[in-house]
């Protein structure tokens, strides 16, 4: 049913303001319907409603965007009356062309008015008056706040050097004039800062993909998905994590063109509900085992593309091993059990995965006999103890079946698109960071705790010859627009102890809109405005060839300022104001400059500045025959080699072999039992696996405090009826979930949409401990580990064992 066919709902949407009741009803009505109607031209969209609102009074409809890190970048329309946002709609007033689809927002973006006008917005600068983490603050003036920040920056630089200053990883800004980039620019102009590499989203897949292909650009335009006949959605849930605006639309179009879609996931996700022909539940952390068993089927049943593995790949069998490793274990030998005595049969994999052997064999045959086919990996499966292995195994299966370099195929891995999925952008001129050192982003707490002891074995980069460790630990933390300082970091109880110790990080400054769990550890909090209260620009996540303008919709509320304006004030105290602002440019000056640059340099895409500004967004239209990743390599591997050391698809990686850590970093992808798993000692006390998915309630932790979203998508632990019955738990019961790292008490959602033995606690809820330190809101990071993965040194926050009981 189209939402436009419901007269009562239409009447509610016609109201000049959208009430909480209407939002909840609308979100419920569209929760499943959105999957059926997403990006389809729906009876003129909502444009008549916008016209009716504009005709009803002095209402201005201002095109803007949704600039948070959900995976999409959608268009919003802010309806403003007397300087107040009274309504949010989306991209519905232009043709919905399959080659240029509308950029429609989900309920997250449509609830944004409640964020702008939330009663708990920070209104003025704050100075800590109690212990770090206590949330005790007093209001101070902007002058006193920025003076304090500048004084501490100067003190730490003079005492320890610039490498003691750290601009924390953060993704809450989303706009060119907001977020961590504004702080990084400030600190780089101030002489530099300790850098970081990797991120919390895809550390393992970023590192593992190039070990096979030599590049991260292994994907192609989403339009090419329409050429596929089979799509394996392996831990991939675009309906909730988005993975680029309109990704659901392209999967739907592929299905309409005849593709079969199979979701392999512990959860019966929204994607499984609306986009899949079949759901295969699988135990978390065992995806590599199922893939290995599929490879066994391909090998033993003669379904290997022999030409591909012989011509384009390295290390499949003993006849195609690299020089110097002729006697090393080949991939085929591992799969057949010739080297370890354990054939990776479907029956072997069933014991680990919980997937019936017959099902594994059937999926292996389908993938081996249906061409072209896609194996699309989601990123949750690589945020695990040995996340690099599932990425590499997922890249090998396309090689075994010859699904690389052909229309409708998919090389897998991180899959940044080659051609057809980018739009020209603009931003601040880059500034060199004079500090050469960087650390893995997920190990920042180690750099606070023991930075002066961290060396190359800890992932430190940039050490000169003769330097063994960092010269100092982090002494000043600068966190702009992010909640990874505490809330989104692993093992929050350990993290808060480190942050609370003022002998370690001596000063912490935070730009924030709310008193988040991370902000509570700041010595000074600088209140930031939302992107609707300043100028900026956003665009292109992984997929989506779009650029969305973010004009100022309303004036900044209270005493808030943009992240850029805040950094400019500090720059003035540091004597680098002119350098930071390039002679005093405001956010609006930069905004106009970027528009002029884009429209001058890319007139064919954006048109002139006036037209681009009026429309508010622009998408590079898709071409009907988009480029295919690695097509030139397949056409001539000698003339167009890959950028791997061998120039081939490296099933066996000599670079990994040379690391000589075969138990954790094997040269060929292998299934490795995780350190927290049903087969580890932890399972005796904590028998349930736990995961934390992206949730429609929020964007990571952004929007967690928004009342409408809280009611529409309450935080609960999702538990299978079998596990609930065993524990005497019924729907809605308050339950305690715990392990050695921490505990929480939240309501239970008893549902067959998660497999037995697994519970799901949606990630991003704000850590809210009671007097006993038990979290009462459901922050999954009270249960997660800070231990990094072995190769990428990335986050492993999906690997945890827990127990659940009724309270």
Describe the function of each predicted region.
Residues 2-304, 331, 459, 480, ...:
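N-terminal export/assembly segments and adjacent metallocofactor-ligating motifs
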Residues 276-282, 545-556:
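Short beta-alpha connecting loops at secondary-structure transitions
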Residues 506-507, 552-571:
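Phosphate/diphosphate-binding loops
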Residues 267-370:
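Long, well-ordered, tryptophan-enriched scaffold segments
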Residues 170, 311-315, 367, 410-421, ...:
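A glycine-rich phosphate-binding loop feature that marks nucleotide/adenosyl-phosphate handling sites
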Residues 563-615, 701-703, 707-718, 722-807:
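Long, contiguous, secondary-structure-rich segments that constitute the structural scaffold
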Residues 327-453:
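Active-site phosphate/pyrophosphate-binding segments
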Residues 2-11, 181-251, 257-259, 263-264, ...:
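Extended redox/cofactor-interaction regions of prokaryotic respiratory oxidoreductases
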């Amino acid at each position: 049913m189209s939402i436009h066919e419901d007269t009562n709902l239409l009447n509610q949407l016609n109201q000049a303001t959208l009430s909480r009741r209407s939002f909840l009803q609308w979100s419920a009505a569209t929760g499943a319907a959105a999957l059926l109607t997403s990006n389809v031209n729906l009876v003129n969209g909502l444009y008549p409603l916008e016209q009716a609102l504009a005709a009803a009074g002095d209402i201005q409809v201002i095109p803007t965007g949704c600039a948070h890190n959900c995976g999409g970048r959608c268009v919003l329309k802010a309806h403003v009356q007397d300087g107040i946002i009274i309504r949010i709609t989306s991209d519905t007033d232009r043709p919905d062309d399959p080659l240029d689809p509308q950029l429609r927002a989900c309920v997250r973006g449509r609830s944004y008015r409640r964020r702008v006008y939330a009663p708990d917005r920070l209104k003025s600068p704050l100075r800590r008056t109690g212990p770090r983490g206590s949330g005790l603050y007093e209001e101070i003036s902007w002058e006193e706040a920025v003076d304090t920040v500048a004084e501490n920056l100067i003190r730490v630089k003079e005492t320890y050097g610039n490498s003691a200053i750290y601009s924390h990883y953060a993704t809450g800004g989303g706009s060119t004039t907001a977020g961590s980039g504004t702080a990084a620019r400030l600190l780089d102009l101030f002489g530099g800062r300790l850098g970081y590499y990797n991120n919390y989203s895809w550390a393992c897949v970023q590192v593992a993909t190039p070990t096979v292909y030599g590049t991260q650009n292994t994907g192609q335009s989403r339009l090419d998905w329409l050429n596929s006949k089979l799509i394996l959605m392996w831990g991939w849930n675009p309906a909730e994590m988005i993975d680029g605006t309109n990704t659901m639309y392209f999967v739907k179009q592929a299905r309409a063109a005849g593709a079969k879609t199979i979701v392999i996931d512990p959860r019966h996700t929204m994607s499984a509900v609306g986009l899949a022909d079949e759901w295969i539940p699988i135990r978390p952390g065992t995806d590599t085992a199922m893939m290995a068993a599929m490879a066994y089927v391909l090998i033993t049943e003669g379904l290997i593309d022999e030409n591909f593995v012989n011509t384009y790949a390295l290390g499949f069998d003993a006849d195609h091993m690299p020089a110097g490793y002729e006697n090393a274990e080949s991939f085929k030998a591992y799969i057949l059990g010739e080297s370890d005595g354990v054939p990776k049969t479907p029956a072997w994999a069933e014991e680990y995965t919980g997937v019936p052997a017959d099902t594994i064999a059937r999926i292996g045959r389908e993938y081996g006999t249906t061409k072209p086919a896609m194996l699309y990996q989601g990123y949750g499966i690589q945020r695990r103890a040995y996340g690099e292995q599932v990425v590499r195994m997922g890249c090998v299966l396309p090689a075994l079946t010859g699904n690389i370099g052909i229309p409708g195929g998919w090389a897998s891995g991180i899959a940044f698109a080659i051609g057809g999925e980018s739009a020209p952008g603009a931003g601040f001129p880059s500034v060199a960071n004079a500090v050469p050192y960087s650390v893995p982003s997920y190990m920042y707490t180690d750099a606070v705790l023991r930075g002066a002891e961290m060396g190359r074995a800890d992932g430190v980069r940039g050490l000169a010859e003769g330097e063994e460790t960092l010269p100092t630990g982090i002494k000043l933390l600068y966190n702009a627009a992010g909640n990874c300082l505490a809330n989104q970091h692993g093992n929050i109880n350990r993290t808060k102890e480190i942050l609370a110790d003022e002998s370690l990080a001596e000063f912490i400054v935070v730009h924030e809109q709310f008193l988040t769990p991370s902000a509570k550890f700041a010595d000074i909090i600088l209140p930031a405005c939302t992107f609707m209260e300043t100028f900026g620009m956003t665009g292109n996540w992984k997929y989506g060839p779009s650029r969305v303008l973010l004009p100022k919709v309303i004036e900044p509320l209270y005493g808030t300022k943009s992240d850029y304006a805040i950094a400019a004030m500090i720059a003035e105290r540091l004597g680098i104001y002119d350098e930071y602002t390039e002679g005093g440019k405001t956010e609006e000056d930069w905004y106009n400059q970027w528009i002029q640059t884009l429209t001058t340099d890319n007139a064919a895409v954006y048109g002139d500045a006036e037209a681009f500004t009026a429309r508010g967004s622009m998408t590079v239209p898709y071409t009907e025959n988009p480029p295919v990743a690695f097509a030139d390599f397949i056409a001539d591997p000698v003339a167009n080699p890959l950028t791997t050391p061998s120039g081939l698809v490296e099933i066996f990686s000599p670079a990994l072999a040379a690391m000589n850590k075969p138990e954790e970093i094997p040269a060929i992808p292998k299934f490795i039992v995780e350190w927290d798993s049903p087969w580890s000692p932890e399972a005796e006390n904590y028998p349930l696996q736990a995961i934390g998915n992206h949730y429609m309630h929020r964007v990571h932790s952004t929007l967690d405090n928004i009342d409408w979203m809280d009611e529409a998508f309450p935080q609960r632990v999702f538990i299978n009826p079998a596990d609930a019955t065993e524990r005497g738990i019924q729907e809605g019961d308050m339950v305690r979930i715990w392990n050695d790292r921490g505990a929480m008490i939240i309501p239970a959602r008893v549902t067959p949409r998660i497999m037995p033995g697994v519970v799901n606690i949606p990630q991003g809820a704000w850590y809210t401990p009671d007097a006993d330190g038990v979290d009462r809101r459901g922050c999954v990071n009270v249960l997660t580990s800070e231990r990094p993965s072995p190769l990428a040194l990335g986050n492993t926050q999906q690997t945890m064992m827990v127990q659940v009981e009724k309270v």
